[in-house]
């Protein structure tokens, strides 16, 4: 069984888009720790949560696109985090930012305001005390820079 740092693994993932984002975050965390395990992580956590097909597919799409555009996402975050060296960004904060940017830039049909709110909630659940403010600040800077509608 996979365990996930920073949150309560026994807490069930809801069969919602929010739950799908949490699933994608957890799978990405495991992909960092054990490269090549993304699909197993997605399958295992989705099965444990009894998550519906459409939300599992959404989580998988988010995670795969996030990995596919990892370098570009890292560069965007690094450029926006003007007072932070990339090595100082907590692993989970970085993953939450990458996941949100994936949704903002590559997944159609989700309002930017919803994506940012969801990222802040993930940061509150899994990040440190100030993670939500950091995530909000970086996403705000990038959405303004990119001219994305909120």
Provide a role label for each language-model segment.
Residues 1-126, 130-150:
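N-terminal interaction/assembly modules
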């Amino acid at each position: 069984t996979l365990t996930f740092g920073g949150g309560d693994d026994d807490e069930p993932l809801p069969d919602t888009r929010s739950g799908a984002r949490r699933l994608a975050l957890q799978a990405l965390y495991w992909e960092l720790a054990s490269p090549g395990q993304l699909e197993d992580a997605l399958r295992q956590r989705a099965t444990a949560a009894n998550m519906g097909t459409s939300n599992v597919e959404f989580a998988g799409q988010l995670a795969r696109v996030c990995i596919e555009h990892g370098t570009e996402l890292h560069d965007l975050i690094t450029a926006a985090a003007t007072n932070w060296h990339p090595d100082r960004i907590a692993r989970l904060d970085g993953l939450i930012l990458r996941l949100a940017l994936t949704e903002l830039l590559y997944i159609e049909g989700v309002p930017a305001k919803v994506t940012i709110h969801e990222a802040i909630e993930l940061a509150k659940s899994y990040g440190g005390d100030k993670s939500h403010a950091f995530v909000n600040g970086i996403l705000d800077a990038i959405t303004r820079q990119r001219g994305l509608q909120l």
